[in-house]
Amino acid sequence: MELPKEIEEYFEMLQREIDKAYEIAKKARSQGKDPSTDVEIPQATDMAGRVESLVGPPGVAQRIRELLKEYDKEIVALKIVDEIIEGKFGDFGSKEKYAEQAVRTALAILTEGIVSAPLEGIADVKIKRNTWADNSEYLALYYAGPIRSSGGTAQALSVLVGDYVRRKLGLDRFKPSGKHIERMVEEVDLYHRAVSRLQYHPSPDEVRLAMRNIPIEITGEATDDVEVSHRDVEGVETNQLRGGAILVLAEGVLQKAKKLVKYIDKMGIDGWEWLKEFVEAKEKGEEIEESESKAEESKVETRVEVEKGFYYKLYEKFRAEIAPSEKYAKEIIGGRPLFAGPSENGGFRLRYGRSRVSGFATWSINPATMVLVDEFLAIGTQMKTERPGKGAVVTPATTAEGPIVKLKDGSVVRVDDYNLALKIRDEVEEILYLGDAIIAFGDFVENNQTLLPANYVEEWWIQEFVKAVNEAYEVELRPFEENPRESVEEAAEYLEVDPEFLAKMLYDPLRVKPPVELAIHFSEILEIPLHPYYTLYWNTVNPKDVERLWGVLKDKATIEWGTFRGIKFAKKIEISLDDLGSLKRTLELLGLPHTVREGIVVVDYPWSAALLTPLGNLEWEFKAKPFYTVIDIINENNQIKLRDRGISWIGARMGRPEKAKERKMKPPVQVLFPIGLAGGSSRDIKKAAEEGKIAEVEIAFFKCPKCGHVGPETLCPECGIRKELIWTCPKCGAEYTNSQAEGYSYSCPKCNVKLKPFTKRKIKPSELLNRAMENVKVYGVDKLKGVMGMTSGWKIAEPLEKGLLRAKNEVYVFKDGTIRFDATDAPITHFRPREIGVSVEKLRELGYTHDFEGKPLVSEDQIVELKPQDVILSKEAGKYLLRVARFVDDLLEKFYGLPRFYNAEKMEDLIGHLVIGLAPHTSAGIVGRIIGFVDALVGYAHPYFHAAKRRNCDGDEDSVMLLLDALLNFSRYYLPEKRGGKMDAPLVITTRLDPREVDSEVHNMDVVRYYPLEFYEATYELKSPKELVGVIERVEDRLGKPEMYYGIKFTHDTDDIALGPKMSLYKQLGDMEEKVKRQLTLAERIRAVDQHYVAETILNSHLIPDLRGNLRSFTRQEFRCVKCNTKYRRPPLDGKCPVCGGKIVLTVSKGAIEKYLGTAKMLVANYNVKPYTRQRICLTEKDIDSLFEYLFPEAQLTLIVDPNDICMKMIKERTGETVQGGLLENFNSSGNNGKKIEKKEKKAKEKPKKKKVISLDDFFSKR
């Protein structure tokens, strides 16, 4: 495939910069001051290179490339399995080793060599025997937790590959006993209940079916400290939950069964007929359920054929086939608002399209909406959504419609402007309509969600307008383009409009709208519906209300009329509030902007015409009609027709807030150097040095072969030559240099025990730190934070010099030696130079010579298409990476003695420099180039760039690191030894992005300028998106062509990609009570939200589980030493830490348990929640009080219950038992209590006043 010169030059430019960074890093590394003398991050230009770098075997990359020219990656995986087992890539020794290499390599191919699952997700591959059956050999795959990162489909395919490997090796099937099967049944259910909710929770029978039929054993290592009751099953090494195996079976094989069947056919693997039958049976069962439910519905339907309006029938069909999905709203976190109930009118109005910063699971909304939801939404905030996917990040689009709000004075305002929103925010009483959510067709395709009926919008209207003009006057006009002047002038003459205006409207119909009288004129002469901007939400209101409104307007309103080319239209309407009465609400629900002045409702131009033109200027009588919506009645009687602008609404709630922040380990670390207890709780190496402490830590030491110097440095401080690693026998303590240990095959010749590269040693921080300070000439740092101990298998410490330079530049290190900055992923395909703070001249240097329409780049306002590996970072990232660049320059100059590289004085100096993008669940980074910065807490990058990390943009956050920092400082020797330690580490980097080898979700992203009429009309038929994949061009249609890299279009522009709130209010508020109050205040203001439901759901899904969980945690808590942080299941008898003598304290406090109690009471007091929920709060408080009262002896002596306590009153109401002196009578222990109680009861009866029992409402209102 031959690429255009500009694209080829771009990739060559990137490679030159990459090679330059590698050259510098190799020079630095060759000095021997690091664990390895070479750069530890290999380059890969494609998927094949990544696979070889991650899992091998050597030489496999070239063969993968050859096979990919002929086959899909699934077939390539099997072909490579064949060749590995045939020995074409070397001798691996045993059958097990052949099987292990084949499975890992195949899984790496299936996951594009990006995720760490092939390394970490498969713990082992063994050949075992069916000893309980016929003693035949079978294959067992041992899965671990990180297999989750590969995704359900790849998990399922790994099982398929395992079966293929089994056949190639001539092994028998796994023949599970009843114990094996029931063990897995228990594990799946227990994991779902006790550990983590599975995306798909299979029934016991489904698990049994799979276990009986899967030809290999799906097993694994223990991942959770949860014991099973089916213990000591033969062949299963653990009695704890095997999380990896559970995920593969439930979320892999069973959840992805339908997709797996397609691969089984494609790959030609037999023995899986049972899965096909399972899928068919499941689908048949769903069809039976559906037909039964439809049969039930048909029973209640009338058998009489009645005449129904078009929209009435559409709504009927819509509601019958696409039910509101309540799943996203079943959990509401305190402080994170519900913005719209499921499919609730007035929620987010669906608008099909893809803005410059949306698509790929991202929604664009008007920035005014962000402001008027109290800025709970900011750029990059995640929302949990009703459809098409489960989540989405929000970005700004000024061409999306904003909210319609009612002010405190009764006026109604359309707020499409961000500045207007800021101005009126404190005057808003109710949000009638939230505004548009621009959602891409590709997201519906990806999630296989039925297309909802499209709401009438400008991009639909302009196509109807152009089509009508072209047919009526035989001219050739095109929407969203600069049309030939002759065609425009000819059409303008026929339409009697200004040619300049017509040209602008055709080019940008979302911003350039005709005046209302002209819109009416167009509708009349072209017989097209009224422009959507002037169409009200007619179908939101009841026809009978419109009938009453028609009468009131006819009889009571003062109307000022105007004319335009013989067309009559209303210029102003005035009517008193008294005359309108309840119909004022009808005007509000119509979304009709109006003002209220001294008891008079005034509807000004153009909204006066928008109200009366559809009603025929009151010249025909509006009459409600059964089975007809308002628009049906209007279209039957009026010359000017309407389309419905408010059919489809989507619900959403707030998810995670946006993020753009430096990555810090907990607690923050500046150098990967162990200091043990000597550094105190802050692990301060400088403090330990100043106090002259000796640290006792497990650390690797090196010995100079020339002078014999021993220490943690890899380079001898005396001779300046590379030292040898010292290996130690853990049994006898004998030490051997690396060359000696190699001769003994790394086993002790005396004890025959495997040698370790580390042992527990005493080190002098003062001596090491002073030498490091002298080396880099850095003396003035306040603190130098190390680690308590190394988590790697080698325990090689980082040079202290690096820590000093990090401390000087105020940056922090991650577990692998790199410095990271995390940010929420956001997509962008086009930008304006002014938005990202970069000059046109600089952009030209970076290869941006033309705008997206092919015109030479001369202005900062031109829209430019983003190149696939360019990134636009947050200004917060710019500030931090500037400090990182200074650190790297200091490192080069002071530690390695090389020239400075970045020489950056301000963050703009970083433009053009390279970074690595990396997602937490992966092990392959992607090289990116910084081209600008925005004032928003997100990481903007091309959707291809995010997909290369196997991410979409539904709320994920990923990291970036400066390329040179990673090349100099990353080392595999620092990676944690535990399972998952290789995740989130750049074990390999992709240098050249190929859209064919990224996550396939981006292949569904649409790349068109507008969606055609055919699409909008098809949505009224509720079609599957798959039926329209040929109608709208997507990335998939361009794969394998040069156009996959360029020429991407968008449907909706925005004035500025950073216009909107920068930080969600959620992050700015204080405690939970304040957050919840603001959340509920907003819920009361949004028409599409029921605040009582919100309060109930917060209590049941967040606050009560938290209160009960914390209460349970208190009774099961560990105890902690304040000095060394050692934890104990039970406190030592003397109350002191046996390790360091420090004070022992609780890990769960009373305050932690009670923290949400006040908030819960506030909700119950102010909102209409169920009695059961109120009682749960009450009883939880009693449990907390009783726990702490009984913890201390003195509390037991004074256990006096509040006489107004609601729980005591409830007991009295239900049992008839009375309260005496604050104690229930059955708590009294005195033998004479009976007589005393009788006396008191008699006295009580003589009193005229009867004590009133306080209700739950009274109790909570008093609180």
From Swiss-Prot:
It catalyses: DNA(n) + a 2'-deoxyribonucleoside 5'-triphosphate = DNA(n+1) + diphosphate; Exonucleolytic cleavage in the 3'- to 5'-direction to yield nucleoside 5'-phosphates. The keyword Hydrolase applies. Keywords: DNA replication, DNA-binding, DNA-directed DNA polymerase, Exonuclease, Hydrolase, Multifunctional enzyme, Nuclease, Nucleotidyltransferase, Transferase. One of its GO terms (molecular function) is DNA-directed DNA polymerase activity. It comes from the Archaea. Residues 1235-1244 have a biased composition (Basic and acidic residues). Heterodimer of a large subunit and a small subunit. Possesses two activities: a DNA synthesis (polymerase) and an exonucleolytic activity that degrades single-stranded DNA in the 3'- to 5'-direction. Has a template-primer preference which is characteristic of a replicative DNA polymerase. This is DNA polymerase II large subunit. It comes from Pyrococcus furiosus (strain ATCC 43587 / DSM 3638 / JCM 8422 / Vc1). The gene is polC.
